[in-house]
Regions:
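Substrate-agnostic recognition of the 12-TM MFS/MFS-like secondary transporter fold
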Residues: 19-36, 59-73, 79-92, 107-166, ...
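Short amphipathic helix-loop junctions that connect adjacent transmembrane helices
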Residues: 37-50, 251-266
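C-terminal transmembrane bundle of multi-pass solute transporters/carriers
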Residues: 56, 66-70, 81-83, 87, ...
Length: 425
């Protein structure tokens, strides 16, 4: 790999193996999120229930609890390029299956579960490839680029889901998504192979007990490795928390648009997801080009307090807009642009957390440990996030979306105060 001291996005993209991996990530993440949000819109429109949407997200998240650690350990010993290719191809086939069953919620939950199971192998295979393809001096910038792609694909997936359903209908939408997975597998196939690694079949041919013992041993080593480094544990905790919160907000999105903003569910992306994604893009670009020169701890601390405060302000605005005599101040003409701005700032705050935390995790986790740590991340999100995600949907149906959002902001702010006190101590 040609060494370069130019810490820039152009410098990262100029490295062809990284560029192919990045293109593959764009297509794959866009396909994943368009699938998820298309199903969320279909389900909410047919049921009108935040809880039903929460179950959909749980169907996608539970496999990370059950198989995240196992997948991370297995991927450690495989050619990660081949893992990515196979995952993309099989997920393309699964999306075509939705073509026939999307009107049956239980079958949708089942197919999405299998889809998410494959993603457990995809995630720990993709992120650890970055340090192998990029010089250490460009790692923060490369992670910034991947964060930009990841979160913009979340927003673009939500943005495309509504118009696709309106213009093409569900069947053609699923065909388009399946094609994106195939294109992603093509780009990843251009990334150089890893040498001296085992095949999946050679691993599975081993005695099952021996394999299980190895998995448990590797998991124990991974847990010990994380607990031995305060920086690594802190980064893992922050990434877990941000992903859980984003998942909760994602489950509340359709209900927020319908019951609070009182707009068409399919337009939720315009007033909710789009500003968040724009903010994430701006934040990631700033961190990657300028912000990386500042203290990672300062960036993270700013992100935590900003996110908590913004969520509470959003909830307060919603509350005031329903108070008799205050409606004229917070009518839709003023309320929608104001909420757009706040969701934009929420996206910026997320980037201040995500990019530095990912960089800390990758720089602290050495060698094959990276895959195990990312496997632990996906398992933690699926395991720890089960209760908050389902509770968020149930509480939103029971007490209202606004109160749930305020509670999230309050908890985040308390965590920021606790972390600040611990850091100063």
């Amino acid at each position: 790999m040609k060494e370069t001291t130019s810490i820039s996005f152009r410098g990262c993209i100029a490295i062809s193996p990284f560029r192919y991996l990045w293109f593959g990530q764009i297509c794959s993440q866009l396909a994943v999120n368009t699938t998820l949000f298309t199903l969320a819109l279909i389900l909410y429109r047919s049921t009108g229930s935040n809880t039903a949407v929460s179950i959909l997200f749980l169907s996608y998240g539970i496999p990370s609890l059950l198989f995240g650690l196992l997948a991370g350990v297995i991927v450690d010993h495989l050619d990660k390029r081949r893992v990515l290719i196979l995952c993309d191809i099989v997920r393309a086939v699964l999306v075509l299956g939705l073509f026939f069953v999307f009107q049956n919620p239980f079958l949708v939950y089942g197919l999405l579960f299998v889809h998410a199971l494959l993603t457990q192998f995809y995630v720990p295979a993709e992120a650890p490839m970055i340090p192998r393809l990029i010089p250490q001096t460009m790692l923060v910038t490369a992670n910034s680029l991947f964060s930009f792609t990841y979160y913009s694909s979340v927003g673009l997936g939500f943005i495309l889901a509504g118009p696709f359903l309106r213009v093409f209908g569900a069947h053609v939408t699923f065909i388009i998504i399946s094609t994106l997975f195939v294109v992603a597998s093509f780009f990843v196939s251009l990334v150089p192979k890893q040498q001296s690694l085992q095949s999946f079949t050679s691993i599975m041919r081993k005695d099952f007990i021996t394999l299980l013992q190895k998995v448990l041993r590797d998991v124990r080593e991974g847990l010990a490795y994380v607990s031995s480094s305060k920086k690594l544990f802190d980064a893992l905790l922050l990434l877990t928390g941000t992903q859980i919160i984003l998942t909760i907000l994602g489950t509340l999105g359709p209900g927020f648009a319908d019951r609070v903003l009182e707009i068409d569910v399919r337009d939720a992306s315009i007033y909710i997801t789009a500003p968040v994604v724009i903010g994430i893009i701006v934040g990631a670009l700033w961190v990657g080009s300028i912000g990386y020169q500042r203290s990672k701890e300062r960036l993270i601390r700013t992100g935590i307090f900003s996110a908590g405060t913004i969520l509470m302000i959003i909830s307060i605005i919603i509350r005031f807009s329903r108070v008799v005599g205050m409606q004229w101040i917070f009518d839709s003409f003023l309320r929608l642009p104001l909420l757009f701005l706040l969701f934009f700032l929420l996206g910026v705050a997320n980037s201040l957390l995500d990019v530095p935390s990912n960089s800390i995790l990758q720089s602290q986790a050495q060698g094959t440990m990276r895959s195990r740590i990312y496997g632990m991340l996906t398992a933690a999100v699926g395991g720890i996030g089960i209760l908050p995600v389902i509770a968020g949907g149930v509480l939103a149906d029971a007490i209202g979306v606004g109160k749930v959002i305020f509670s999230l902001g309050f908890v985040i702010t308390l965590f920021g105060l606790y972390r600040l006190k611990r850091y100063n101590t």
